[in-house]
């Protein structure tokens, strides 16, 4: 019953707000139309759907989320929901401490922060135990050294979460600001 409500709500929303012509305008606009669509999506609670209620989410389950994503696909929705909200948000929800969870999930759900997860490395076949990207501390600053590839939705992200290992082989999740002068990208 909940999935039917989600599906009907999303279908009506897209029928009213994302015709084929509107979608093409969004894709060719400078972002204003897209941002308007995101604001409306947030008002419907879609950004809070996958997250626990104690962090301001709606506590939806995987079936709720997949119902919504299926409707996104059927409507040719342009938001990288999985890569800029669901994947990084769930990483934060499961691996960050309580204060950081509250802080970042609130920003994901209510503000306009978009994240990307930078997990792919050459030659490791997605095995987290074979990470080559290193994190190290020097003069009270953290540094990353290594290569990552294919960061989905990075072009729209404010920040990127990067898994890296230290000298003792502990895995760290490092959040870097996409606008930092120290952030280098080949985009």
Regions found by a protein language model. Give the residues of each.
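Buried hydrophobic positions in well-ordered alpha/beta secondary-structure cores of metabolic enzymes
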Residues: 3, 14, 45, 52, ...
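Short secondary-structure junction/hinge motifs that connect adjacent elements
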Residues: 21-43
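Short alpha-helical functional segments enriched in proximate histidine and acidic residues
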Residues: 13-20, 107, 115-116
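Internal helix-loop-helix
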Residues: 43-111, 153-156
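Flavin-dependent oxidoreductase catalytic core characteristic
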Residues: 1-18, 136-141, 169
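Glycine-rich beta->alpha junctions and the first turn(s) of the following alpha-helix
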Residues: 1-2, 6, 74, 87, ...
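Short, small-residue-enriched loops and turns at beta-alpha junctions
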Residues: 27-28, 56-59, 123-126
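FAD-binding core of flavoproteins
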Residues: 106-187
